[in-house]
Amino acid sequence: MFPSDLGLIDANGLIQALNQMGGIGDFNDRDLARFQKALTSTSGYTGYNLEKTVKRFLPAYTVLCNRVARDNAPVGLMAGPQAHYKAQLGYSGFDFGAAMGTAFGANGSDGNPSATDIGPDYKSQSIHGSVQLEAIDFARQFDDPLQQQSLFNLTALMRIEELLVAGGNEFIISTPAPTGSGAGTGTTFHSGTWTVKVTALTEEGTLRNQTGAYVPVVGKAAGETVPGTASIVLGSNQLYLDVKWPVIKGALGYKIYCSAAYSDSTDVYLLDPATELAYKDGGTIHTSFAGQKYVGVNHVRIIAPPAGTQGVPTLDGSANANQFEGYWAWCTKTTMYGVDLSGAGQRVFTDMDGAAFTSEDGGLVEINDALQKLALLYHTAPTAMVGSPQTIRAITNKIVHNNNVSMMLVGNQGGNLQQQNKFIGGIMVGGYTNTFAQHYGMSPLIDIIAHPYIPDGNLMLLSETLPPDTYRNANDGRCFALDVLRPYNYFPLASVDRNVNFDMWFLETLKCMYPTAQAAIAGIRVE
């Protein structure tokens, strides 16, 4: 049985099926009438959109996803896990199989196909649930367990979906480019050859869909590359290893691995940023969460050999298969569109090399540079800046320290003398002024959003809409949209058992129509 509207129970059909059930013991007419009343008239589940209820508990997902336009998927049988989409892709040389994570994605002719048929069954998340019929007792003022179980399932699904939209996969990157060792008077590192490897924490999807080192190996999941290994030859009495590597387009953060003993090129183990790593100038690395093993910078010191025994991820693709893009991927590269936009004059991207933001009289140098390039190259202006809470805190501290924010004095509010002439402690920088957006329909104020799932040291500048000047003689356009398959329920009702089993699945796919309007700053030192 399928509901007539996504996210809603077909109460009449459910009751009709229950009335036709036989052999269910002492489930008498009085119980059935009470069950029917609960479902059809007063239950919070019937006729209620569970998606909105669940999103109240997922603030980060709500803030980001509710800002962009929504394209609702078709209803009915085609809305299930086997739903198919016709995707228009206007670029040639696109590796459909690699991008979609399935061999069946390569439908269509070679060259520049007008469309491809995508069966995104691997993107659907589903949760199985069950409730006991006798537990549904509206007369005693209990919550409908069918509603509660469904809300629980949907919450789990949307937490999965939020991670898929905002990040959560780890891929191995190519060889880092270490600069060697910093001299010291201590004896932390024995003379000899030390091995260092680096992995990248990325969004779901490939690192870059282009020729070169980032092309997926045949037969393996999209996004995998050969692990990067750097050998550092040291003299005696070295205090630390100085290691740097280029910012990996699409990476959110990095994990650093090192050999536990000199001249061991085989066994490398994960380093703890709190005790075994430092910033490039020796400063202590402070992570947002205790036990966080990744860093947001691409230039560090290794100040101690690894004490743990966690090795480098495997290459078999078992943990990375069939993943797809998220917000950050569109800011640093474009995989779904099959074109490398990381070259000069194409991608607005800043590699901080482990440095902190730089202050100037008009704000922060790196942010202003990115805003200027977006206005100059693409005639657009971001409407949102998204980073980790620690990254937003670093922006706030820099702006306040440079006196680029105004203090607010609380006056006499409603005659309350206790509230008169008091300063409010603490500063929240909830927006940033775009100096280059005074006209053409651009937004001069950029909303700042702290997203808990983005690792430290990364800042996205999202253009959610295009001003009329970008395409002259046109209205405002949109850069992002959500293909939405709202919660969908399936109830294979029991004919004998009182236990009702059901499944629920949920799907949202983010689309970016204008990837060049997005900018990113990576490798920022935040404290």
Report residues per predicted region.
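Disordered, low-complexity "stalk" and linker segments at domain junctions of extracellular
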Residues: 167-336
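Stable alpha-helical elements in mature extracytoplasmic
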Residues: 146-149, 157
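Assembly/oligomerization interface modules of large self-assembling protein complexes
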Residues: 37-128
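Solvent-exposed, polar/charged alpha-helical surfaces in well-ordered, non-transmembrane soluble domains
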Residues: 151, 155, 369-372
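Sequence/fold signature of self-assembling virion shell proteins
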Residues: 2-42, 47-51, 55, 136-137, ...
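Sec-exported extracytoplasmic/periplasmic mature domains
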Residues: 154-162, 166
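Acidic Ser/Thr/Pro-rich low-complexity disordered segments
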Residues: 95-116, 205-221, 263-279, 407-417, ...
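Extended amphipathic alpha-helical segments with heptad-repeat/coiled-coil character used for oligomerization
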Residues: 168, 379, 383-384
